[in-house]
Amino acid sequence: MTPLLFPLLLASLLPSSSCNKANKHKPWIEAEYQGIVMENDNTVLLNPPLFALDKDAPLRYAGEICGFRLHGSGVPFEAVILDKATGEGLIRAKEPVDCEAQKEHTFTIQAYDCGEGPDGANTKKSHKATVHVRVNDVNEFAPVFVERLYRAAVTEGKLYDRILRVEAIDGDCSPQYSQICYYEILTPNTPFLIDNDGNIENTEKLQYSGEKLYKFTVTAYDCGKKRAADDAEVEIQVKPTCKPSWQGWNKRIEYAPGAGSLALFPGIRLETCDEPLWNIQATIELQTSHVAKGCDRDNYSERALRKLCGAAPGEVDLLPMPGPNANWTAGLSVHYSQDSSLIYWFNGTQAVQVPLGGAAGLGSGPPDSLSDHFTLSFWMKHGVTPNKGKKEEETIVCNTVQNEDGFSHYSLTVHGCRIAFLYWPLLESARPVKFLWKLEQVCDDEWHHYALNLEFPTVTLYADGISFDPALIHDNGLIHPPRREPALMIGACWAEEKNKEKEKGGDNSTDATAGDPLPIHHYFHGYLAGFSVRSGRLESREVIECLYACREGLDYRDFESLGKGMKVHVNPSQSLLTLEGDDVETFNHALQHVAYMNTLRFATPGVRPLRLTTAVKCFSEESCVSIPEVEGYVVVLQPDAPQILLSGTAHFARPAVDFEGPEGVPLFPDLQITCSISHQVEAKKDESWQGTVTDTRMSDEIVHNLDGCEISLVGDDLDPERESLLLDMASLQQRGLELTNTSAYLTIAGVESITVYEEILRQARYRLRHGAALYARKFRLSCSEMNGRYSSNEFIVEVSVLHSVNRVAHPSHMLSSQQFLHRGHQPPPEMAGHSLASSHRNSMVPSAATLIIVVCVGFLVLMVVLGLVRIHSLHRRVSGASGPPGASSDPKDPDLFWDDSALTIIVNPMESYQSRQVCVAGAAGGQQDDEDSSDSEAADSPSSDERRIIETPPHRY
């Protein structure tokens, strides 16, 4: 088998060897080709044309070109052979090309021959040539404007080279079709021109008095003269001559209580009229002096607020209401603030000397009573008096205290905008120390609260709840000591012994009053209120801040985004905020974040005037602009008033023995007090609902405090000898509440939670003295909060007293029951005007059968009585001439004899006095006219649907 295979293999190799010798050369092509293909087409035009040459031609296979190969990643083209003999080829795109996707393509091409036979054996390849194909653009896209609407503003009377520029773009890839060659204004008769770059200018000076807003349409064309598919609108606003000022602010700013922080100028910007500035300073001033005492504070009374803030008790009021026990303030001029607090006016020529001892609650007391640990607290409104020198000292308080070691002395004075505290620990040995503060609050003629804590040698002054350390401390060792006698004076001070003669001639001094040999000087000129002192434990900073800090003011919190070079300063009372910077845009951003804030849930409604003052510095002082002042106001809206609802049992009756017990009967055993706020809520729109969607109100229950409740009488006052209102005094004192109990009302005063007031009012009891003939009482309960600013509904409770009546034998035997009164037992006059409760009538109402019998018998008796009355009246008319009215001519005549013993009068104590009046009127009408008997019957029938008892006017027997 092997000898046969070898010749066959040799025979197959011999022809191959001869063919390799025939295909001696590889194909040849150009080194580089440049091609062009039209967009959206696939035929590439090459320069030079694609031809491949082979030196083996004209041999078959070896001299023929079988094809071309393209090399490159993602080449969207292919090469095809058109003529193998000539080597002509063609490059075409696999699919239409997009110029916008790719403008040029680069790849390599290589030709290969057909080898040495039909099977392509021993194929040779040419070198690789570079092909550059450029995609020619077609103007398929129209210009498109970047904006559909262009806006600009111009100042009147000026010609602008360029007001604004409109811009259009073209999506084509070639410069010829992608470039915008020119723009055109389509709206005729407009005083504007547009150039080929889209710049718009005015052809004449525009006037603000003429047309204030110009609107026109522009279009664009590319270099292929294709017009924009959508035109653009242009609006040019004509403004008056530029005046440097603040723009984009609102004069009226509404603030809803509970809204937190509200930006005052969210859209404000400074118009400088292109004047370069290098420094801007703005001051925002919020005026709150007209709101209570200088600003919005908690609306509770001073006493209630001290309890809420956790202040320690024990303060002594040095300027109380003038009265028998506080006559030292009688000579001062008295005013009242908006919150009804007492204000005293010191005119610079008067002062008060507070008596020591029980009257003022002061006195010698323990050794350290007012020596080196105490707190002075007061409200002051003080300004610089024009006719007095700036160095004129005015004394607020002057006090000398006696203790175990001797005498100590202190005084608090103001001079100008400075406030000074002089403290002399021991007149005999120690040296005086003077603490000075310079505060703008002292002389701004506005209300401020001051609290001075002395814990010697530390002295801290609080103004509106903000603490201030002394700016300067003097050791005034050369001051002559005052007299060694305990004394306390407000509004002035007494002169020391050594300076007595010197001070007599001063402008701010007078002779001493009777009993005081020393002159008084350094009178105070201003307002004082709430002047108190407390010794021992000092008020903490938190308590003072809670009591007297302002709850409204200017606020700035955006410090994180505060630009470089910006400065922000807020005064302690938050009524003045200052901004300073050098960049206009940064300054605008900072001013837009200045806010108003009021932390009170029930803020005081009203207007807070607002003022913005600006000072600028320019690079050119000659042409520096001036920014006018901005004035506006913040309107604090009326807060949603809390609705205090009192509810419970409004009518009940109890036996008299319950009222006569030692504890009486609770008036409000199941009292419920709720506090809620109703606010406007926008109703959600239901798509299936075809009607009108309106706003509604939603009520949210809140946790709140009450500061007073009153139980008053509806009708006559209480008779102390027969009735009284009772309340547990120990429970009230434990909670710090005050009780006022009179014959007309009972009041509970003091701030406490609703739960506590519910508990206390449920303990309110009504008590009667044993045997008191009272049948009904009405009580009115009402509560209030926030110093009486909000009041509850009037909850009226009607109380009925059920009395037991002994059985009385009736001569007619028609009715005998302990529930009914015989006419011989006329109820006392006290019963008039009172009604018994219907909710507990079962104990006095007979059964249904008895009730029917009573009604029927009563009706029969009424008919008999009416008949007798009719006969009696006729008899009186007949015999009127012969005898006195009402006398019978024949007393023995049984038909004309008036038998009172046969008539039974039944009185229903369950009916009101008014119902009985109606019955009496009806009965009287029946006696006058027989034809009105039907009306009498209706009038004699009470409206009560439980029982009907016939009544006649009472008679004495």
Swiss-Prot record:
Record topological domains on the Cytoplasmic side: 870-957
A GO molecular function held by the record: neurexin family protein binding
Biased composition (Acidic residues): 928-938
Gene Ontology biological process terms in this record: excitatory synapse assembly; homophilic cell adhesion via plasma membrane adhesion molecules; inhibitory synapse assembly; negative regulation of excitatory synapse assembly; positive regulation of inhibitory synapse assembly; positive regulation of synapse assembly; positive regulation of synaptic transmission; regulation of excitatory synapse assembly
PROSITE patterns in UniProt: CADHERIN_2
Keyword Membrane: yes
Bilayer disposition of the protein: Single-pass type I membrane protein
SUPFAM superfamilies associated with the record: Cadherin-like, Concanavalin A-like lectins/glucanases
Cellular compartment(s): Postsynaptic cell membrane; Endoplasmic reticulum membrane; Golgi apparatus membrane; Cell projection, Dendrite
Signal peptide residue numbers: 1-19
Classification via Pfam families: CLSTN_C (PF19699)
Source domain of life: Eukaryota
Post-translational modification, as annotated: Proteolytically processed under normal cellular conditions. A primary zeta-cleavage generates a large extracellular (soluble) N-terminal domain (sAlc) and a short C-terminal transmembrane fragment (CTF1). A secondary cleavage catalyzed by gamma-secretase within the transmembrane domain releases the beta-Alc-beta chain in the extracellular milieu and produces an intracellular fragment (AlcICD). This processing is strongly suppressed in the tripartite complex formed with APBA2 and APP, which seems to prevent the association with gamma-secretase.
Residue spans, topological domain Extracellular: 20-848
GO CC, alphabetical: cell surface; dendrite; endoplasmic reticulum membrane; Golgi membrane; postsynaptic membrane
Transmembrane regions: 849-869
Region (Disordered): 919-957
Domain Cadherin: 29-145, 146-246
Glycan attachment sites: N299, N347, N508
Entry text on domains: The cytoplasmic domain binds synaptic Ca(2+).
The protein's role, per its UniProt record: Postsynaptic adhesion molecule that binds to presynaptic neurexins to mediate both excitatory and inhibitory synapse formation. Promotes synapse development by acting as a cell adhesion molecule at the postsynaptic membrane, which associates with both neurexin-alpha and neurexin-beta proteins at the presynaptic membrane. Regulates the balance between excitatory and inhibitory synapses by inhibiting formation of excitatory parallel-fiber synapses and promoting formation of inhibitory synapses in the same neuron.
Family the entry assigns: Belongs to the calsyntenin family.
Cited PANTHER family: CALSYNTENIN (PTHR14139), CALSYNTENIN-3 (PTHR14139:SF5)
Oligomer and partners: Interacts (via cadherin domains) with both alpha and beta isoforms of neurexins (NRXN1, NRXN2 and NRXN3). Directly interacts with APBA2. Forms a tripartite complex with APBA2 and APP. Interacts with low affinity with KLC1. Interacts with SLC23A2/SVCT2.
Protein name, UniProt field: Calsyntenin-3
Organism of this sequence: Bos taurus
